[in-house]
From Swiss-Prot:
This is 5,10-methenyltetrahydromethanopterin hydrogenase. Keywords: Methanogenesis, One-carbon metabolism, Oxidoreductase. The lineage of its organism: Archaea, Methanobacteriati, Methanobacteriota, Methanomada group, Methanobacteria. The keyword Translocase does not apply. NCBIfam families: hmd_TIGR (TIGR01723). One of its GO terms (biological process) is one-carbon metabolic process. It comes from Methanothermobacter thermautotrophicus (Methanobacterium thermoformicicum). It comes from the Archaea. The gene is hmd.
Amino acid sequence: MKLAILGAGCYRTHAASGITNFSRACEVAEMVGKPEIAMTHSTITMGAELKELAGVDEVVVADPVFDNQFTVIDDFAYEDVIEAHKEDPEKIMPQIREKVNEVAKELPKPPEGAIHFTHPEDLGFEITTDDREAVADADFIMTWFPKGDMQPGIINKFIDDIKPGAIVTHACTIPTTKFYKIFEEKHGDLVTRPETLNVTSYHPGAVPEMKGQVYIAEGYASEEAINTLFELGQKARGNAYKLPAELLGPVCDMCSALTAITYAGILTYRDSVTQVLGAPAGFAQMMAKESLEQLTALMDKVGIDKMEESLDPGALLGTADSMNFGASAEILPTVFEVLEKRKK
């Protein structure tokens, strides 16, 4: 199998968050006995996993940065990073972040510059600056592109070079539905049918070097292609999940924090009103829908930054407390603390 990786990534944004580390990369490095994998990141980590754990025999990475300032920081011994991650990653991560932030001050952002700790060629990958060369005869095309609006212009340059039946994936910078539309608008539905092109995601749901997981979107690829990618993901990433394409963003992107809170609220509310109060599921669903729709409508009407002006968070303290029983009692006390801090 040939894997084409389009976009090598840059560590500066990972370092800037102040919370990421190389836990997964170190784990894989130890598993396969290749320390140089320990400080890979982004698509390079996922490419190494697919090569070493899933048997992908050809990996090509395409990025214009290879003709520019692709910078490899070699201040840290891979073995030291691995050992630190066995105990506490924060024993070494502050120094790594400090160095990255220092280098980033002088280095241009992608595609003019990028920060890495291992060169892809040292992992047995081929490199190129030509996306068309990379995708030629590729079975699996993993894209790691800038934000969504820039992607049509990039994709249109190589779309005609994708072989029939190939799997093409995106990550965190675009929804699957919009990603599919780029291909559909170029060639129409006939050419984007599964026998011609399988559009889905290989979304890590976090920085790949930190967590071993991948989320695969269903709806725009054949069942066979989804199953193939799922099996690869299980071998390479350790944990793989299939979900409807429409849910990929809410589950995997930064709004996942809100999705998690909302989903936990729905589930505990449902159990409280149906199991304790004995309300029919249909009635519980109707009330839940009203809550979600009206809060969304309020946000749309006044803006997320002005919601408190229309609905005082304190208004819920004297009403929701009457529902503080059953499963809802698992989360409501913490919710009340948050609302109390924000009431007018």
